[in-house]
């Protein structure tokens, strides 16, 4: 009896090894996450490690740490002032609530003359402006409270969940174009706006994964079509005639 040897065409999966390799290839650990209707973490991944957005926030602040000096204002607490600052002479913490024991200034950022004028060399504003309805007023107040030559280091969410305490006052998401227009109207040309993140980073962040659970090589990829957050480095003019 003549034996016949089966010839496997290039690219065809052998019947003796049906699709197991393909299943492993196309069913990564992400698939169960993508089938969920609720995230793995309800607090942006804080209970699993550092949230994915913090990876980008800390990279941005590290890149501009030379500006975190002199008299520094930060919102909520002074963690980034302490971690990235050098030559910090005075540190203030801004909060809208007097219940925050770390707050040294209790004020609404969107109110005119809420903050001391020309007081700060650096203002660290991390993931805050989405909670301020009157953005134009807030940016004017930020500009007013900086010293001439003072620097704003700001991060803005492009993709994020709404926190359980913020359903009533989470107003905005940002793109580089919207951030550029918002800050250019007040700071003029002395702004640098960038976006960071990609599809994988956005998916992981919304799913509640921590940054430690995602490959840093992939987190480093920036896709302008899938920004996770927007960063703004804005300098107040040293000229007293500047807006």
Residue positions per predicted region:
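Acceptor-substrate binding/catalytic loop of class I
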Residues: 48, 163-182
């Amino acid at each position: 009896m003549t034996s016949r040897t089966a010839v496997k065409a290039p690219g065809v999966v052998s019947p003796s090894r049906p699709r197991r390799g393909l299943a492993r290839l196309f069913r990564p650990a992400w698939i169960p996450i993508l089938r969920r209707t609720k995230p793995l973490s309800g607090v942006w991944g804080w209970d699993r490690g550092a949230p994915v957005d913090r990876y980008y926030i800390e990279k941005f602040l590290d890149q501009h740490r030379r500006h975190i000096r002199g008299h520094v204002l930060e919102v909520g607490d002074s963690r980034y002032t302490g971690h990235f600052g050098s030559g910090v002479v005075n540190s203030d913490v801004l909060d809208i609530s007097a219940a925050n024991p770390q707050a040294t200034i209790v004020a609404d950022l969107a109110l005119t003359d809420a903050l001391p004028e020309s007081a700060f060399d650096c203002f660290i504003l991390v993931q805050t402006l989405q909670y301020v309805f009157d953005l134009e007023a807030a940016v004017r107040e930020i500009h007013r409270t900086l010293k001439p030559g003072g620097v704003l280091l700001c991060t803005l969410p492009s993709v994020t969940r709404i926190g359980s305490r913020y359903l009533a006052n989470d107003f905005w998401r940002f793109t580089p174009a919207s951030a550029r227009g918002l800050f250019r109207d007040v700071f003029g040309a002395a702004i640098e706006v960038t976006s960071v993140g990609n599809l994988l980073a956005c998916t992981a962040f919304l799913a509640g994964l921590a940054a430690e659970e995602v490959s840093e090589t992939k987190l480093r990829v920036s896709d302008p079509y899938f920004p996770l957050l927007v960063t703004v480095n804005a300098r107040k003019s040293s000229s007293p005639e500047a807006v």
